[in-house]
Amino acid sequence: MRLRKKNWTDDFLNQHSFYLINYNNKKIDLKQIFLNNNPTCLEIGSGKGQFITTLALKNLNTNYIGMEKSSTITGVALKKSLKEFENQLKDMTNLKYFNNFAEDLSQMFSSDSFNKIYLNFSDPWPKTRHYKKRLTYVKFLDIYSDILIKNGYLEFKTDNDSLYNFTIEQLNLTNKWEIVINATDLYNNTEFLKDNIPTEYETKFHLANKNIYKIVIKNLK
């Protein structure tokens, strides 16, 4: 997501560096980062942090990482997360943020690092010439398969018809994934809505009567 530069975020991130992951050209050791062996989940494009903060508060024995390209957005998300944990009188020990690009995930993390990956309302990159930048392009699907455990899951949500169709096409180009949920109208499916956690964008789009797609795929390696 795009967000105008906020002058306070750099200082805020420096003051709260404990909650940030820094990549120094070595594989990131998640056990060292979280000081436990709990399952770890990754949200690629964590936005203002509503989704991953809600997950982390609901599942204190699972580790979560929110990844964004923009340090400004990360600052906004981290501030929100810390406030939500404080409001519930809980220490934020299972949620970290970091800035980087999805292209670099295999360099930063070892194989089988994550139990689940979330892609929520990623940039659809609508121009045809930009199709390789879409986060469900087959190159990215291969990266996710590498860093995800066998039989781990990737959850994808979008309101964009073209990105949904593109994602299905890309999944048909690889044998590393099995589609286990393909909801073409999430909010008319009570079964899939039971445990649904909406993002900021999702709430906005749903209130505007936009259709929401959800795909869940299992990593076959």
UniProtKB/Swiss-Prot annotation:
Note whether S-adenosyl-L-methionine occurs among the keywords: yes
Q: Which residues form the active site?
A: 123
**PROSITE patterns (UniProt xref):** SAM_MT_TRMB (PS51625)
Its taxonomic placement starts with:
Bacteria, Bacillati, Mycoplasmatota, Mollicutes, Mycoplasmataceae
Its Enzyme Commission number?
2.1.1.33
Q: Which residues cross the membrane?
A: none
Q: Which reaction does it catalyse?
A: guanosine(46) in tRNA + S-adenosyl-L-methionine = N(7)-methylguanosine(46) in tRNA + S-adenosyl-L-homocysteine
Listed binding positions for S-adenosyl-L-methionine are 43, 68, 123
Q: What does this protein do?
A: Catalyzes the formation of N(7)-methylguanine at position 46 (m7G46) in tRNA.
Top-rank taxon = Bacteria
Give residues annotated as binding substrate.
Answer: 127, 159, 199-202
From what organism does this protein derive?
A: Mycoplasma mycoides subsp. mycoides SC (strain CCUG 32753 / NCTC 10114 / PG1)
Family, per entry: Belongs to the class I-like SAM-binding methyltransferase superfamily. TrmB family.
Pathway membership: tRNA modification; N(7)-methylguanine-tRNA biosynthesis
**Gene Ontology molecular function terms on file:** tRNA (guanine(46)-N7)-methyltransferase activity
A single GO cellular-component term from the record reads: tRNA methyltransferase complex
In the UniProt record, what gene is named as encoding this protein? trmB
Coiled coil start-end:
none
Q: Which UniProt keywords apply?
A: Methyltransferase, S-adenosyl-L-methionine, Transferase, tRNA processing
Q: Does the keyword Transferase apply?
A: yes
Q: What's the protein here called?
A: tRNA (guanine-N(7)-)-methyltransferase
**InterPro entries given in the database record:** SAM-dependent_MTases_sf (IPR029063), tRNA_(Gua-N-7)_MeTrfase_Trmb (IPR003358), tRNA_methyltr_TrmB_bact (IPR055361)
